[in-house]
Design a protein with these regions (language model features):
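Short metal-binding segments enriched for Cys and/or His
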Residues: 1-13
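Generic detection of long, well-ordered alpha-helical segments
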Residues: 2, 61-68, 190, 210, ...
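N-terminal compositionally biased, intrinsically disordered segments and leader/signal-like regions
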Residues: 4, 40, 146-150
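TOPRIM metal-binding catalytic domain and adjacent DNA-binding surface shared by DnaG-type primases
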Residues: 11-115, 123, 225, 260-279
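Phosphate-handling DNA/RNA-contact segment within nucleic-acid enzymes
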Residues: 94-202, 216-217
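TOPRIM fold recognition
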Residues: 127, 139, 165-168, 174-279
Length: 279
């Protein structure tokens, strides 16, 4: 025996049923009139993650590049873990790649060769791509990041790999984040904004090791005042960022240990910060 949409809503959700009756009343409908049941376009609930794109036009995954390719040489020189080659892309025509992926991006681009770093959200939706130039000069823009959606939310790299039940590390550079466990990257120096928007039990903010950079120093001071846990790099570390430390010969495990031993907050953070900064 069939039933009307109104009867069904009354049985399932009384609040929704009242809203439905009100909408009918506003439309001049009543119980004695003939009307067509409305169509509800309710999005399907999302269970788990989507599959990431398996191919892109005008680009190929670095894991598919032939041995000796100059892009692979770049990755090897940066000591990027091979496990991430299948997640990074190479294009010899960045403009063509972007024009196809995001036709109305509105940016003036050069059709040069770049390593492409895809940004995904927690559901594996592609939200942005960042192209790192492989051949640079004084006029080259090293990183060009393009959003693939209309969202104005802060871009964060690594959200697809994040486990909020473990300590979350926040760094600046996407490449830096590839060397640390459970790490995301802000793409800029405003790490605190990223940390504030991640719901995790414990978060550690890891600024670049630039004690003479006024902007970094200012942002670190703000993080300390907000009572965040941050890393104050020891004097024994001369490298500017995580990737430089790796290239200098420090292993990822050693860096993790250094981070753990130098994560501070509150008064201890302020005291160590005062000795660390050089401006």
């Amino acid at each position: 025996m069939g039933t009307s949409i109104g009867k069904l809503l009354e049985q399932v959700d009384g609040t929704l049923y009242k809203e439905y009756i009100l909408e009918r009343y506003k439309a001049g409908e009543n119980g004695n009139s003939n009307f067509k049941d409305p169509t509800f376009n309710v999005p399907s609930p999302r269970f788990g993650k989507l599959d990431k794109p398996k191919q892109f036009e005008h680009a190929e995954f670095c894991s598919d590049l032939p041995s000796g390719h100059f892009c692979l040489d770049y990755l090897k020189n940066r000591k990027i873990p091979k496990e991430f080659y299948s997640q990074l892309l190479f294009t010899s025509h960045y403009k063509k790649f972007i024009d196809t992926l995001v036709p109305n991006h509105g940016k003036k681009l050069v059709d040069d060769a770049r390593v492409i770093i895809p940004f995904y959200d927690v559901y594996n939706n592609l939200i942005a791509v960042s192209g790192r130039a492989l051949e640079t000069n004084d006029k080259t823009v090293r990183y060009i990041t393009i959003r693939t959606t209309d969202s104005e939310d802060k871009l964060v790299f690594g959200m697809d790999r994040l486990n909020v039940h473990e300590t979350v590390k926040v760094v600046e550079g996407p490449i830096d984040s590839l060397f640390l466990s459970n790490c995301v990257a802000s793409g800029d120096a405003n790490l605190t904004a990223v940390a504030d928007n991640i719901s995790a039990g414990k978060k550690v903010i890891i600024f670049d090791n630039e004690p003479r950079n006024k902007d970094i120093v200012k942002l670190m001071q703000e993080s300390i005042k907000s009572n965040h846990q941050i890393v104050i790099w020891p004097d024994t570390i001369q490298a500017k960022d995580i990737n430089e430390m790796i290239i200098s010969g420090i292993s990822p495990d050693e860096i993790e240990s250094i981070i753990s031993s130098n994560t501070v907050s509150g008064l201890e953070a302020q005291l160590k910060f005062n000795f660390w900064k050089k401006v």
